[in-house]
Amino acid sequence: MKLVALASLVALAGVTSVSAAAGTNYFAYNSTAVTTFKGVYLAPTGTTHWGPNQALNDDDKELDFGERLTLTGLNPGLYDVKLVDQKGRTCIMHRVNLTKETSFEIRDTSLTNCK
Amino acid sequence: MITRRAVLIGVPLALAVAGEARAAISGMAYASNEKDNTVSVIDLAQMKVVKTVPTGQRPRGMDLTSDGGRLLVCLGDSNRIDILNTKTWAVEGSINTPDPEYAALRQPGNNPLYVSNENNALVTVWNIDSQKMLGQVPTGTEPEGMAVSPDGELICNTTETTNMAQFFEYPTTKNVANVLVPPRPRWAAFTHDGKAVWVSSELGGTVTVIDTKTFKILDTIHFAIEGLRSTFIQPVGISITHDDKLAFVCLGPANRIAVVSVPEHKVLSYVETGQKVFDANVKKYLLVGERPWHASFTPDEKYLLTANGLSNDVSVIDVAKLRVIDTVPVGQQPWMVLISPS
């Protein structure tokens, strides 16, 4: 029972860390050669508590290659990032560290596990 | 900060070219590092970074006064352009303007400064001595490249989303022509005789040559590289030699610079910034220089330096030999490189 309660707290903390508004601006750089993303979701590493679609923060609601996306509502921490490209393929980047860095890059090598 | 990757690539390459003859170069080059919020100062004689200057947030476009004494750095996230003294690196003044991406000085006289304000669909005009705004001009969506003709009478701005090259007269800033070009025009460069302007289209994969008297399209230059998907060919920066014979076009993720005959509008060859270099120490081929977006010549035009955004370095191309002869690690995501005129 205690374990369940603890797990719930951890999960809740995860949700909070994604949804809580923070003062720092975070960014994702799309450094792929030709891939545009219509979905960019972050969840605390090891969870599937995906936050809102951050791609909607962009003017055209997509993260184009060569473009930078402002990420909102994040606190420092480790995140998994779910990327959805224009063809609907989904790719996961694991353990993106936004503890010290305020940005991360999506490269072509980040897209090797897309389904 | 230099990434580990940049160091691993840069050191063996430096070893590989250490014995290669190179004419003496003097002066300084400046690379704006978008992700690091710094400008790297490269001593061309040593071909290494001798100073890293902290800047405001997101340094991208830059321009230099004609004597090289002041470097103007567009700081997109700080909503200003800082004017840096290139001897002391003190900030001599700031122009407060929203989301500046590129800026171009009118010559001669170092004034005014034309700024593309990306998110405001404006070109703003500034006096850099008083840092006062002289005017503003509405543009299409997402203004990008800024260029001023050699005689200072014509201003060209490219609008990334509306796919136009827009032309304005000096000093009225009257809009005299709008020319549709292929998607995502990023950069404009006038030929030195002022007769044409070359506009790169990143998504279109082309360079459009426009007559500056009639504003008619003279030609559209296409690029094709064997073994490379056409979508990887994304032209951005264009550097034209002073004799208007050669243009060097940065092709982004193609990791190459196209060498184009200016009179014929014809691609002559491609220089790989990601050139394969044999290193006697490590016995393997190395790739350097990923995603070049902008380049600048040394004053004698013997060398061309490219800012490579993904490999965090600057490639040095021997213009006569058309090959990369050196690589200088700089900060993260170098956007543009400029070279002091003296």
Residue ranges of each PLM-predicted region?
Chain B
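Short aromatic/hydrophobic-glycine micro-motifs
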Residues: 1-2, 33
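N-terminal export leaders
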Residues: 2-8
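Predominantly soluble domains enriched in secretory-pathway, periplasmic, or organellar proteins
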Residues: 8, 12-342
